[in-house]
């Protein structure tokens, strides 16, 4: 095996710099841009991951506000300090959260907990109080409260919360839940 000493390294660097100088500015910019793209790719296909949250206007009356925030199991306490341990014990692998606004009046939040197995989502759902709730047809099992809705589907547990109570908001929560449910089978992130 050949060892490179400092003289050889200097010669290689000199040759590299001479080659770069022969290229035009535009060509160097293209090389740098292509290298940056190649280094920055995070998915195997190069495609952006599918969002589990409906975009603004996908569900009537709902507009997504802000960026999706992601928490792994280790950092979940930053989002739900005091209750994170319950989700960790149930096998949460990732939590996604996004803010929404309903009919440009009511703020809300959608939380999607991706569990390592469906039994984890079922465990969390079963610990949610059924008091003052009614069952609704969303996912594998769902409960609608005055200003919130929880449901589970496969390995996902979803919590929607609106910061106002009304029958219109309750109906809106069901529609948003169905919008999220339709995306859960797509394997997004």
Model-based region annotation:
Residues 1-22:
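N-terminal secretory signal peptides that target proteins for export/translocation
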Residues 27-38:
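Bacterial N-terminal signal peptides
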Residues 95-101, 145-152:
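Short, surface-exposed beta-strand/loop micro-motifs that present aromatic residues
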Residues 106-109, 144-146:
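Short, surface-exposed coil-to-beta transition loops
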Residues 111-114:
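Short, well-ordered beta-strand segments in beta-rich or mixed alpha/beta enzyme
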Residues 116-120, 143-144, 157, 164-168:
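Solvent-exposed loop/turn segments at secondary-structure junctions
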Residues 116-139:
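N-terminal low-complexity, intrinsically disordered segments
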């Amino acid at each position: 095996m050949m060892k490179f000493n400092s003289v050889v390294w200097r010669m290689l660097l000199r040759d590299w710099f001479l080659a770069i100088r022969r290229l035009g500015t535009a060509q160097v910019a293209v090389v740098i841009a292509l290298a940056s793209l190649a280094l920055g790719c995070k998915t195997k296909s190069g495609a952006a991951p599918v969002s589990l949250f409906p975009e603004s206007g996908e569900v009537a009356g709902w507009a997504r506000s802000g960026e999706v925030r992601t928490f792994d199991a280790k950092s979940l306490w930053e989002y739900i300090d005091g209750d994170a341990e319950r989700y960790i014990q149930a096998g949460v692998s990732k939590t996604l959260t996004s803010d929404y606004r309903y009919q440009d009046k009511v703020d809300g939040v959608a939380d999607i907990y991706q569990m390592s197995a469906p039994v984890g989502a079922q465990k969390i759902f079963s610990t949610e109080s059924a008091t003052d709730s009614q069952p609704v047809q969303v996912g594998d099992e769902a409960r609608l409260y005055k200003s919130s809705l929880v449901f589970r589907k496969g390995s996902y547990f979803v919590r929607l919360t609106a910061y106002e109570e009304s029958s219109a908001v309750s109906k809106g929560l069901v529609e948003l839940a169905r919008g999220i449910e339709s995306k859960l089978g797509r394997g997004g992130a």
